[in-house]
Amino acid sequence: MKYIYAGDAFQVVPSQRWSAEVPVEAFSIYRGLRTVNPSPYMYFLDFGDFQIAGASPEPLLTVTGRHVSTRPIAGTRPRGSSLEEDRRIADDLLADEKECAEHMMLVDLGRNDLGRVCAYGSVVVDELMQVETYSHVIHIVSSVSGTLRDDVGAMDALRSALPAGTLSGAPKEIGRAHV
C-alpha cells in the first residue's frame, strides 16, 4: 500500500505461490475444470514432476503475421438467473467507477506493451469497454492492436506483454519489484 500512497503505483496485486499434492491424476483435474468452468483458453502442461492446469477467457496476446493484439479483461460479476438480470448486472458493472478505472489501467498497459514493439502510430484501441457474457460470469473487455515493427517478432511481443497487468498492477516495474 505504501507505493500507492506515495504515488508510485496505481495498483499492486499481492499474490503468493500455491501448490498442493492431491491423490488424483492432474489431467483428471483439468478435465473436471473443462466441465465446471468451460473457458475459451484452457491449458494443461505436464512437466514430469509437476503439472499446471488453467482456464481463462482472456488471450494475453495474439500474433498473426505482423498483426498483434491483446484483449484486457477487468471488471467481473457473476451471471444472473435471467437475461434481464444479466443486462442489469452488465449496466451496474459499466457504472462501477472502481471496475472501470481498473479496466482503463489495463487498456493503458496494453497500449504501452504493444507500443514497445509496434510501428509508430499503429497501436489502436479497437474496442473499449464492451460487455461479454460467459458461462458463469460477465466481464468488461477491450481490444488493443497494432502492427509489429520489422525488427521484432512474436517472442518480442510476448516479452513486452509479460507479466500480464492483472498480475503486476501498474506500473508493471513497480509491481514486479515490490510484490
Q: For each of these PLM feature ranges, what is it?
A:
Residues 1-178:
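Extended alpha-helical targeting/anchoring segments
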